[in-house]
Amino acid sequence: MCIRDRLDVVRLIAMFTVVCCHCTDPFNFYPGDSPIIGDIKFWGAAYGAFLRPCVPLFVMITGALLLPVREETSIFYKKRILRVFWPFLIWSVIYNLFPWFTGLLGLRPELILDFFPYSGEEVTRQSLSVSLGYIAQIPFNFSLLDVHMWYIYLLIGLYLYLPIFSAWVEKVSDKAKLWFLAGWGVTLFIPYYREFVSPYIWGGCSWNEFSMLYYFAGFNGYLLLGHYLRNHDWSLGKIVGIGIPMFVVGYAITFFGFRYTTALPAYTEEQLELFFYYCSPNVVMMTIPIFLLAKKVNVKSDTIKRMLANLTICGFGIYMVHYFFTGPSVLLARALNIPLGLQIPAASVVAFAVSWLIVLGIRKICGKKAKYIVG
């Protein structure tokens, strides 16, 4: 298999795990009380921690495939940004109009929370003015109804940054890249320093948020890591001997850290996300072994290769669509009395399959114009 085919395997893992990740929301943000609320929260944390590599894997795939950038900058921007912009805009509007649509259909307001448990009570007003207010915010940020769109803002930013970063990546040695990754690795600890030691570090203060290692921080490290690991493999023995223990340690920190913060009498959103933070050492420790192990998969079946190739085409559309189905899929799993510990993966299979079928249908019906809807 060529490297692109191997990265298709990584993409399948990333795509499915991001759907799984959003299927944990009805567990981690379970509305109301339940006799088994402790078990519900446990499984939400257990799966939520396990699935944190989903977004880093996407960014690493981007770095592996696009660094260094070979196209002229304006062509690259036109090709990459326009591909995501129109579907992002269309689906953002659809998600934000959903509460209003439910009101027009005479559906109960609580249904909105079944679909989007993260959204809170404001959306249950089923008001056009509320929906239009959310739509007006699209140029600036996502809303409570389309939380998953945060990644598209990030992705557009990465696309804008890639040709600039690429000029350095193309010229420097592997040793220089490793030095950059070392600097990035130090920044991964900053969220914990801010929480447990001081809100400011290395020149950061109330009038300066750009501290000493600011320019090494963020998702650009995952871009470079994906680029670097594209051509630097570990042996299977090294993955088993080093990678799997590394994953286990990263998972333990993520899981027990999340359980610690959610057990506090009161916690902020920043504290809630602290151990789930994508740019953290524990999540990096989980992500690297998955990326390297997935690259080892050698798919020989032509049918599976075609399926993976189709996922590459449909993947962006699946990401756009899937958030509509994660909540209802969990409700279906509960209605079918699937054991609690299996509800998240079962719901994920349903949400993933339905989303994929919808994207295939849109592409078949709309032909070439489907790119404006599902990428």
What are these regions (language model features)?
Residues 3-375:
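Alpha-helical transmembrane segments and their immediate juxtamembrane cytosolic regions
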